[in-house]
Amino acid sequence: MCRLPGTTEPYGQAMLSAAEHERLLSVLPTAWHPALSHGRIERVRSGMSAASVFQVGASHFLKIAQGPDAHDLRGEIDRTAWLGHQGVRVAPAVKVHAAGDLVAVLSEALAGSSADETDLPAETVVPALARALSALHAIPVRDCPFDESVAVRLGRAGVLVESGLIDPGVFASRNRDVSPAALLERLRTRKPDEQVAVVHGDATLSNLIVGNDRSVAFIDCGHAGRADPYTDIALVIEGLAERFGSGAVDGFMHAYGGPALNERKRDYFLDLYELF
């Protein structure tokens, strides 16, 4: 996680103090200062990302990453831009800065609310998400330069498990008595047949922004790439079932189109996400 120069603590969890604001400006180009010198700047939840995330007024978000995490943010910027060029609704980058081991991006805020917090009813949200994911998964995969296959994800998971960075205490109840190493081995030996599509890669409801016009946008796109569609489908239907009840799963699959729900793949990709 990026830290303010001269401190050992992460950025403030609410509105930045004047001193924190000055330290934030000190790591960014002077050309950025006018955009960051007026209005409220708040630290916000960053989800799975190791980057520090700030809301700048009502119109922009700022992400900063330093050290090893900077590479991941650079990848997120590239993948988000690629999706945007394919016509996918994403948060447009206004400014990008990369110097030394620090990367920062200032992006436009998107109209709407995340699918886990929207006030829109299930009969609006469920088909909207299904249509958005179906369209994303229909992008020609040959044009996508980013590999997020099971092999790639298992390799990444192996590093995390070996480094002791996976907390089994947050595993779902079905894996409550399974160690990270045992779960990894199970995933390695029970790989499903993979289909390949362009996926978001971290499609929790918090990363899907639903507008009042029923449009859907994608944020936190650092794991977008070529992968099995169930990389996304499993997470979305799990979130919809928790938010709206099990009937939302049938509604999603009907609106998404294609074959009936593959429960084996759903379970596999939910388990793989435990090591994400």
Locate each region found by the language model:
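Active-site Asp-x-Gly
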Residues: 70, 150, 193-198, 211-264
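Short, structured helix-loop boundary elements
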Residues: 70, 123-126, 177, 181, ...
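Charged phosphate-binding loop/patch that engages nucleotide di/tri-phosphates or the phosphate backbone
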Residues: 19, 258-276
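ATP-binding pocket architecture of kinase catalytic cores
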Residues: 43-146
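Juxta-kinase regulatory segment immediately upstream of eukaryotic protein kinase catalytic domains
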Residues: 2-39
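An alpha-helical support segment within catalytic cores of ATP-dependent transferases
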Residues: 20-33, 135-201, 260-262
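Active-site acidic catalytic loop and adjacent metal/ATP-binding pocket
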Residues: 45-62, 182-231
